[in-house]
Amino acid sequence: MKFLSEDFLLNNESAKLLFHEHAEKMPIIDYHCHLEPAEIYENKKYENLTQIWLGGDHYKWRLLRANGIPEKLITGDGDDYEKFLAFAKTLEKSLGNPIYEWTHLELKRFFHIDKLISSETEKEIWDEANQMLATDDFRPRALIKNSNVKVVCTTDDPVSKLSYHKSLAKEEKDFKVLPALRPDHLISITDGHFAEYLMELSAVSGIKIKDFKTMIKALEQRFEFFTSLGGRLSDHSLSTYTFAETKNVDLDSILQKAKENQTLTDLEYNQYITALILEIMKLNKKFDWTMQLHVNVNRSINGPALRKIGENTGFDSMGTQANISEELTKLFSKAAELEIIPKTILYSLNQNDWLELATLIGCFQGEGVQQLQLGAGWWFNDTAKGMEKQLEIFASQSLLPNFVGMLTDSRSFLSYPRHEYFRRVLCNFVGQLIESGRIPDDEALVGKMIEDISYNNVHDYFGFFKNEDSKQ
């Protein structure tokens, strides 16, 4: 089969039919990403391919380092064209890596350039792409609109004033840019900046934080504020997690120790985190939000690189907490007793957790359709094989037609072809089930499932259009 042909990843006739007749046409809701709302509002113009392709993309940075490229041409102050040449040189060696497919798919879909990036074509591609980047069609809003994206959910700190979201809500009519609340600084209470952060949270919420209860009250105010601007999700990263009973625990004392940068015992930290997550579950439930939990990830594990370059620069790895499902089971059992389990999507960076998490989810489903879900293959699992494995586990342990599907988790405005990539994998997976006689060869039945997973489910699950739908 030709590279990136119309039928790439579609290995049977059923898959081809499902993709071209059902998946391909569906709009996109990107419910988890790391795009900057300021860049969307200001409609930033990118000067060249390096700025839009390599800026902030730690997936690509890892490959560049593996190819011996100096940091000056990765995150440093090197010339943009030299950075692009280094990437082109590296990409030639990335055969079999999804970045090779993604990059060429982006080149083909956005720039309509159907050439392989290589030392022979790099200058031609650079010039041709940069000429197009100078046009308004390659500003962020046009890229979003022309990708048929209806909703973008950014990732935002609770103290954010969401000024760009406010402005976009007034001015942008073709798509929604909605905030998703991610309180990392309430989880990372041992980083030495906790007291300073609580002062920020207090100021923006208008609530004096003097203890754990008032901290949660301030957080609730931020949930209300985010909700007023269309917020429907919270997101939480737990590198590791150990459940701890919180009954009769002096949480105020733990909070005070953290504010004073005193060393917390492991038990104290686990008690605080458990209490915090339970309160966050309660708030998600109250506001009819969805809680996302990202677990089993080791972040910024290269100390010198962290100090020199900073976080989110490509020095993270898969976590190996073997009992994470056991600890989460205790958390959800406690939440069930308190009747505070919200809609939840669980992601683990370690594939070994997926089957355990899928069976855990089945024990705590509440009222409503698929309230708890196993999230899409995340980060290092955002590959054809990773996507297929997640689909297989979801289908075998729950109801695949209820799955809310793909998200980019990206910092790039050119990442939307990843939805196409996922839909191709989905159609091929389902097509194989048809071809092997495991599900009916019924286009109406199966085609609807493909359309639902691609768009309809996420539209209904999160309620982004609840007000508009109620008026119809």
Curated annotation (Swiss-Prot):
InterPro entries per the UniProt record, alphabetical: Metal_Hydrolase, Uronate_isomerase
Alphabetized Pfam families for the sequence: UxaC
Enzyme class: isomerase
A GO molecular function held by the record: glucuronate isomerase activity
Disulfide bond as UniProt keyword: no
Coiled coil regions, renumbered to chain: none
Protein's name in the database: Uronate isomerase
Family to which the UniProt record says this protein belongs: Belongs to the metallo-dependent hydrolases superfamily. Uronate isomerase family.
Reactions this protein catalyses: D-glucuronate = D-fructuronate; aldehydo-D-galacturonate = keto-D-tagaturonate
Pathway(s) this gene product operates in, as recorded in its UniProt entry: Carbohydrate metabolism; pentose and glucuronate interconversion
